[in-house]
Amino acid sequence: MDDTELARLQQVVQADPADIEARLALLHGLVRAKRWHEAEQLGIPLLEVEDAPATVHACMGIVYGKQGRWDEAVQQCRQAITLYPDDALALFNLGTLLAHQDDTKAALECLEKAVAHEPEWAETHYTLGTVLLRQERYQEAIRAFDRAIESHATYPEAYFNRGNAHALRGLEADGSLDYYELDCAINAYKTAIQQRPGYAAALYNLGMVYQRMRSSEGVRVWDQYVEATQDLPDEEIWRLRAQEYKHDLQDRLR
């Protein structure tokens, strides 16, 4: 919905504040436009309407979440799901919010339901994968990232986290390396970088894999990372570490 359509809906709502359908359409438009304050101002009165539709609660869950008002966001998403249990978007948003609050079990339950309702929705698979990754359920996380990639081939974040899952599987408890898993991690990181040139986190983690493998490729990757982040102040500490790792690797390769 473009600005012209939003302006038209605002005029309709101003002319007839009792037109609930127009107010709902405007609320959707403001949420899509990421105009959170305006959406909040419109949505609060709609919540007070008797038998407010599930879509109002779902939209306000998104708005409150974007504003960092986590408890209110969770409450709104739960109300939306109470009214419409099969709302995949509300389930996805609730799962994301619960993951943010470290309620992993409930988050996984919501995300798995969302996936069941919308199996082609890449972002849901990806978010499910990130929660599983934090739970160290690496193989399940990899499957979730694979499904995200199947639904949306250009998804550098999914390849990046797929690489992370393989990299963590590649480090055995006794300190030994599983080179098959590390090779899978390398390929995933490379694809992420190919899809997003200069992807700092993927370059850094790729460098770390080569560092552990004592591969000369690590020297080249560390140089790439330093070059890609030279104008990024937030990467300064990591850039210094990368330079240290590079020198250490060069010493080991001599």
What are these regions (language model features)?
Residues 1-10, 33-45, 67-79, 101-113, ...:
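Structural signature of tandem alpha-helical TPR/SEL1-like repeats
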Residues 50-123:
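A generic tandem-repeat structural signature
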Residues 15, 49, 83, 117, ...:
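Structural marker of alpha-solenoid helical repeat scaffolds
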Residues 20-21, 53-55, 88-89, 122-123, ...:
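Helix-start (N-cap) detector for alpha-helical repeat units in TPR-like alpha-solenoids
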Residues 1-7, 212, 219-254:
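Terminal, low-structured helical/coil segments at or just beyond the last alpha-helical repeat
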